[in-house]
Amino acid sequence: EFFESGHDLCVSSWDVLTAQVRLSGEILLYDENGAEAGVGTAEYLLDQGQKVHMVTPDRLIGTHIGPTNYPAAMKKFYNAGMQMTTDHRLVSLRRESGKIIARLWCDLTSTPLEKTVDHVVVENGTLPADDVYFELKKDAMNLGMTDIDALADLHPQTINLNEDGKYRLFRIGDAVASRNVHAAMFEARRLCMVF
């Protein structure tokens, strides 16, 4: 639970990007993650002609977007007239007269701000997609463990905790936490470059 109340009044960025929901009217997009999913959701909604107000607790929109993609996204946002609010957290949501009231909070000034919208989309990253990892772990030679010292010293992973193990298994990328593609590829490369 990322905010006080009104969780049932919002949808996730993935609900939007996978077309599980169709939104119209004024949309508040709250992006606590600052990565591609939030910016991509804003672009997707703008392409559909929606009126989007993007809010983030960070000092800038898309704080984890790289320098190549950032200018293109911001240009699109400005050209579309998208409203952007930084340094504000989503505190709560409530329904009133058929609309949703989003209560925001600025940590810098300790002041609240309320926005009235038709829909709220929240991007908080993802929980680890670790079900396959845990299912396979018991049959792995290393029981899913990574030798951190060997990893740091660029040595092969040789842990053998299961003599009946059939393979080595390592937990990287979204199996650990919300990651972008570059981070997951970097983790895989670092781990596998000495095999």
What residue spans do the PLM features occupy?
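A conserved short coil-to-beta-strand element within the FAD-binding core of flavoproteins
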Residues: E1, T86-I101
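Rossmann-like dinucleotide/flavin-binding elements
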Residues: E1-P67, D107-H119, E123-F195
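Helical element adjacent to the flavin cofactor pocket in flavoenzyme catalytic cores
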Residues: A73-M84
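Residues that act as N-cap/strand-start positions at coil-to-secondary-structure junctions
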Residues: Y78, D87, D107-T109
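Short beta-strand segments that buttress and anchor functional surface loops
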Residues: R103-W105
